């Protein structure tokens, strides 16, 4: 039987075919995750996240149809603080707009969970999954289910007896980071099943690439705090913040550590500064990879990652200067996911393909 060798890993034609099919499934999940995060971003930017006040995992898929059903949903929304404080003049038609955003976000979440579960069952029944990756593939639908639970936990922070007019920024950040962890995991798995013509990089390059992924995730976390606190609406100037390098009020909250999570000014300041640190780290990484494995695909990817980080920072600046319109906010959020995905692909590629275990 003909065989194919990948980084000293020998594959039969059937194994190669199975890996490609699993990759297509994983990339489908990845694209759906991208869509969910972007719809979630639009849901947040349009103030739609609290429009559905109940969690019905099964029959919640069916939206209101009759006028009475719509009135019932609207009445439930009228009981929460967001309506009482911000939207007392909202009409039923205006409510329908925010309802559809949240409904679409939830239905997409259920759909990606279904795709993940059914795909896993299909590949398992047809014996296409190699033993050494079965548990990792099983983890995908589990992570997606957990993300759904975290999503409801986030929404619940703005319901009931809460006096919040939006969800908790802490829970929003956790929800986004959990989504990013799903994206990281799926990307890492799919790239591990790819074909590589170049040998793996040394341990130093591999570890550095992994740390870069972590730093990008930290920057996304601070971006989520910016979103949750609406911190992009303040100090819409660059490179200075209201004409200052260190603006007044950075440490106004007591205790001091609270400023880094609840002070909009401080959170935006940290998000800005960490982006500069991230770029410098990416440049050092590119130089290190070029020195370790000169003129290799690893080095080329590291350079391209630097370019992507600069482009993402530029997008962030434009978004800030325009006071975060929905379109630019979504483009900036989508750009962050693209940078994250590419960094994970780069990290996984430095390791080579998964070994075959019969």
Swiss-Prot record:
The keyword Transmembrane helix applies. Signal peptide: none annotated. It catalyses: Fe(II)-heme o + 2 A + H2O = Fe(II)-heme a + 2 AH2. GO terms for biological process: heme A biosynthetic process. The chain crosses the membrane at residues 22-42, 107-127, 133-153, 172-192, 208-228, 269-289, 302-322, 324-344. Heme binds at residues 271, 332. It is found in: Cell membrane. Its EC number is 1.17.99.9. It is a multi-pass membrane protein. GO terms for cellular component: plasma membrane. It is an enzyme of class 1 (oxidoreductase). GO terms for molecular function: metal ion binding; oxidoreductase activity, acting on NAD(P)H, heme protein as acceptor. Its cofactor is heme b. Pathway: Porphyrin-containing compound metabolism; heme A biosynthesis; heme A from heme O: step 1/1. It comes from the Bacteria. Keywords: Cell membrane, Heme biosynthesis, Iron, Membrane, Metal-binding, Oxidoreductase, Transmembrane, Transmembrane helix. Its main location: membrane. HAMAP family: HemeA_synth_type2. Catalyzes the conversion of heme O to heme A by two successive hydroxylations of the methyl group at C8. The first hydroxylation forms heme I, the second hydroxylation results in an unstable dihydroxymethyl group, which spontaneously dehydrates, resulting in the formyl group of heme A. Belongs to the COX15/CtaA family. Type 2 subfamily. Interacts with CtaB. This is Heme A synthase.
């Amino acid at each position: 039987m003909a065989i194919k060798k990948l980084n000293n890993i020998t594959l039969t034609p059937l194994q190669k075919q199975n890996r490609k099919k699993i990759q297509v499934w994983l990339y489908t999940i990845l694209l759906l995750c991208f869509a969910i995060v972007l719809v979630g971003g639009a849901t947040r930017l349009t103030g739609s996240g609290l429009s559905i006040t109940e969690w019905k995992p099964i029959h919640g898929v069916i939206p209101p149809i009759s006028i009475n059903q719509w009135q019932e949903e609207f009445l439930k929304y009228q009981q929460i603080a967001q309506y009482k404080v911000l939207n007392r003049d909202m009409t039923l038609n205006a409510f329908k707009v925010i309802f559809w955003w949240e409904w679409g976000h939830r239905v997409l979440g259920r759909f990606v969970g279904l795709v993940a579960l059914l795909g896993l069952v299909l590949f398992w029944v047809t014996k296409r999954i190699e033993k050494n990756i079965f548990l990792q593939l099983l983890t995908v639908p589990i992570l997606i289910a957990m993300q759904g639970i975290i999503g409801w936990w986030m929404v619940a922070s703005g319901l009931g007896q809460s006096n919040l007019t939006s969800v908790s920024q802490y829970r929003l950040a956790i929800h986004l980071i959990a989504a990013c962890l799903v994206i990281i995991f799926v990307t890492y798995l799919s790239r591990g099943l790819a074909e590589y013509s170049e040998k793996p990089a040394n341990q130093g390059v591999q570890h550095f690439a992994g740390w870069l992924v972590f730093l990008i995730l930290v920057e996304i976390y601070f971006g989520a705090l910016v979103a949750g606190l609406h911190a992009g609406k303040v100090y819409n100037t660059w490179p200075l913040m209201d004409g200052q390098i260190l603006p007044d009020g950075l440490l106004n909250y007591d205790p001091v550590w609270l400023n880094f999570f609840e002070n909009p000014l401080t959170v935006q300041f940290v998000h800005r500064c960490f982006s500069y640190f991230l770029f410098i780290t990416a440049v050092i990484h590119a130089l290190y990879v070029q020195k370790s494995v000169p003129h290799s695909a690893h080095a080329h990817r590291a350079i391209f990652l630097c370019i992507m980080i600069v482009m993402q920072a530029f997008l962030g600046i434009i978004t800030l200067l325009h006071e975060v319109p929905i379109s630019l906010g979504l483009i900036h959020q989508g750009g962050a996911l693209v940078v994250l995905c590419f960094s994970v692909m780069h990290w996984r590629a430095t390791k080579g393909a998964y070994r075959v275990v019969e």
